[in-house]
Amino acid sequence: MTNTVTVLAESTGFSAVNTIWVLLGAALVFFMQAGFAMVETGFTRAKNAGNIIMKNLMDFCIGTPLFWLFGFGLMFGDGKFIGAYKGIADSTYASAAPDGVPFFAFLIFQTVFCATAATIVSGAMAERTKFISYCIYSAIISLLVYPIEAHWICGGGWLADLGFHDFAGSTCVHMAGGVAAFVGAAILGPRIGKYDKNGKAKAIPGHSLTLGALGCFILWFCWFGFNGASTTSMEGDAIPLAGKVFVTTNLAAAVATITTMIFTWIKYKKPDVSMTLNASLAGLVAITAPCDTVSPVSAAIIGIVAGILVVVGVEFIDQVLKIDDPVGACGVHMLNGMWGTIAVGLFSDGTCGEKGLFTGGGAHLLGIQLLGMVSVIAWVAITMTIVFQIIKHTIGLRASEQEEILGLDVTEHGLVSSYADFAPAMSQAMLSYTKDDAKSVVKVDKSTEPVVPVEKAIKVESYATDAPSADGTPKMTKVAIICKQQKLNDLITALEDIDVTGVTVTNVLGCGMQKGQPEYYRGAVVETNLLPKVKVEVVICKVPTRAVIDAAKAALYTGHIGDGKIFVYNIENVVKIRTNEEGYDALQDD
């Protein structure tokens, strides 16, 4: 079998080792999708985990046929600005493949690179983007935006003729994806609760740094294929070059990670885990363009700058520009893609082209790199602004207020939780949410007419008696209110208005199925559905029970089934442990 393959390779002019090298690289770059999915899922909230996984899956699945049908032709067709389209990707474009590599091996290699550029946007627009709108974006970037700018650099376009150098995609993949992410996040607006009324940024922590770290390690591992296999050969001079690429890639990432750890340790008094994970990716992005043409010392310097740039960039975008990027995609990919592009013009040792400014080559290469960087930024920014604005003003770009607060897993996909048998954690940002935090989203609760009266929407079940206590002291009553999570702030405000200040809030799951609105899992109807709710409990003595019930109804009522339930119970006694007071006295404020 081995001899047959060798003879066939020789007779067709293909190189078995080069083909294997390219296919191995394609497999590793494909697996980067899993890395991105884990990073984005871990850095965001659990209620959106399924939605993020779905978006990463669809990035690749939508992009693959579109790149095959149209994108590859635009990227590798003849022409300096736009490739001349000659039909779907087939042997017509065989001349685009590197020496010794079959066309279809080269096609899959380019396909996975296109998918990488598309998936970068997912993290920056996470937790508030309509799924259908994201799918449309994904199709357009794979069909048109990426192939055209990549043609300029990798497909024999005008930047390639000028000597622009982007070995594995700092510019055409990462910077382009980062710019698209920046534009999308800016047009989309911040998540509910991200900024207070004064515009100060508030942290919305991700639910699993463990998943984020797993994604980071997957991406680091796969980056050896992303950069290393971009040699497209393992023969002749490409053999030592591949080793050099592996070393510079690894070194830049490691140094960037150390730099950010030290920088955040000094800045925040403790080393920041999420920023340090971002730094590993920032170093990888920055070294992707110059990895073949810089020395290990230069790679370390590139890593140092990347480690500082990612922290400063993420903070600037988040706190100064007020653009909400949940995973730091803009700081990692856009800013460090720019830095990697510029680094070629500064540190190139001439291995694969001109020398850079700091290595005796003057400013010529740096000028070309800057021209290419600005050109790609302009192309992506303009086209993606048009795309996102059209989507925004037609089918809508952003999920509704109610959908965002409940989570896109349940509202977009009917998925109550991505973690079976685990109750979702209640976000601190959700607890402090106010209507003013979401001026750019649709107010769902106010947009529809009530369909049932308040008595049916909010049922009251009383287990309390009206008889006074045996010793004549004021009667104590517990009121338990089950309601939607997004109504919690309104309810607490209403209770405070009637001088009920002590409340206990518990995260619970409610079981129910609304008529005419079945949910499906793998095609089967889900007969019961556990939905996230909150239980608010108050024990009252001085405040009338009826006043609490009326206040709760006023705060929770929308006129739809599921507004909530109120339970009323007798309380035999209350003991305040600190003062040993009992009964009425134990319920009074100090």
Where are these regions (language model features)?
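Glycine- and aromatic-enriched membrane alpha-helices
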Residues: 3-463
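Positively charged, small/polar-rich N-terminal and surface patches that mediate targeting and assembly
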Residues: 411-415, 430-590
